Structures are given as structure tokens and as C-alpha cells.
Amino acid sequence: MPTIGIHASHEQLSPARLLEAVRNAEAAGFRAAMCSDHLAPWSERQGESGHAWTWLGGAMQATSLPFGVVTAPGQRSHPVVTAQAIATLGDLFPGRFWAALGSGEALNEHVTGDPWPTKRDRDARLLECVDVIRALLRGEEVTHDGLVRVDRAQVWSLPAEPPALYGAAVSEETAGTVGSWADGMITVYQPVDVLRRVIDAFRDAGGGRAPVAVQVHVSWAEDEETALQIAHDQWRTNVFGSELAWNLELPAQFDEAAARVRPDDVTEAVLVSADLGQHTKWLLELADLGVDAIYLHHVGKEQDPFIEAFAEHVLPELAS
């Protein structure tokens, strides 16, 4: 069975509350954690966005969990800076850290004032960043002149073994590209038949038996109405297609775009149910795809009731 972890949502909880949540999750039986490197939340209602890399040092010291981060080198974060951060966490916490590299969203990257590239150029930039980061993690001095520029850079403090570099992918096309270079893939929950094709595209393109992790957005409460209300309040800005999600620049723009999203529309992006047996069924179907890790993201701001309920009723079923 896959490792069951928790997704720590910087966009919704303050760094201190998020640290408390992952400590409670570990104590309850979750076996891993991940987060995303965001500068801004998806909605003004979410209202937070701590610095992921700073927080990771504290969270990994405070727990014994393995952690991963989804990040987008190339604009807001220069690949040399990203490589140094990866190396430092890899040295501090050997074997406990991975980083997933993606092409990013304007929501986080527009702040540099540089033009927002096309998806084609962002994908090309990402591949350049992967090459730069890998070379730096091997201890090489790097000079590069392309969509990113590097002048005689070196990362001086290196771990004995470099952390795994995953690729972030949602579509079959991107998964195929990721399979050609990544040590693993992180994707998001979709209908099982769609997700199977994404995973197959990754494996067929060279991913082979490399790890596949899936982030799953869930909403649980003791009654259906509350579970749906939580999902609609906190995650209705996350139901859009990739083109819109990539290109909006401000949380207020996401809120405006989501003004007509109905509660039932959110169930396309979030597994909503008050029935813990139903959540177990959904996750068992996902496990049957042969994924290596599932990271559960309860989209509400109150994490403890979710952690306690899933630890008692869902995690044991997934471990059997």
C-alpha cells in the first residue's frame, strides 16, 4: 500500500499553525508530508502564504517525517538559489527530502516584473533549470546562458546523496516530458481513468518504476452540508482549467473568476463527503493504480478534526 502523508497548505494556515498540524499528523499516524512553495494564496479568504523553504527547516527538525516541496525555479527563484536550498535540506536531513520542479504560475512569479512566458517557454526554461540544478548538486561549477543565466556558480555545501528531483505534472503531455528527466512524479487527483493515463505517460516516457505521488484534496466534516460548505469557501478558486490557473496574477482575480462557482462545482476538484467509508473507498481505488504515496489535503482551515478522524477510520483501512 502507498505511504499516506499530509499536504501542508501554506496558503491557508500560518507557519506556526501549519507546524502544529504536521506534528499532530505524525503523532496520529501519517507517514510523510509535502507542501508547495507559494508567495500568494489562491484566494483572499485563504489569507496566508509563509515561506516554504524556511518553514521546511523547522518542520523537518520538529518531526521525523520525510518531506517534499513543489517549487518553480526560473523566475521568482533562481535555479542556483533553489539548488542551494535543496542541498542544505538534503545535508541536514539525509534521505528525508525531495523537491518537485514545475513550470510555475503567474500568481507567484509575476512579482519580479518580468514578462510571463508562454507555457512552451516555461517548459523549456524548466528543463534548463533542471540541468543547472543537477549539475550544481553534483558539485560542478556552472555557467549557462539561455532562458536562465548563470555565471560561475557553485554550491559549496553538498549532501552525501543529492535529494530526488521529482517533476510536477497534471496532463499526459507534461507527464511524458517529466518521465524523460525526473526521479519521480507528483500529480493531483483526477478521475481514475484520467489519472491512469497520466501515470502511464510518465512511466512509458522513461519513468519506469520511479515513485509516483498523488496529492488529493478532500473535505470532511460530520455532516455533508458542512463538508461541502468548507470546500466551497476555501477551494472554489481551484476548479479552473490550467490555462486560467497559470495566468491569473492576484488572489483577487481568482476570487473574481470564482464568483459564480457553485458548491457542487467544487466536487470536481475536491473529494467531499461526511462518510469516512466513502473517503476510504476513493483512496483504495487510487492505491490500486500502484502509486507510491498519497498526500491528503483537507481543504479546511481546521486540521485537527480531519487528522483525528482519518487516523482512526481511514488510515488503518489503507494499511491493511
Give residue ranges: language-model regions.
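Active-site-adjacent structural elements that line small-molecule/cofactor binding pockets in enzymes
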Residues: 1-320
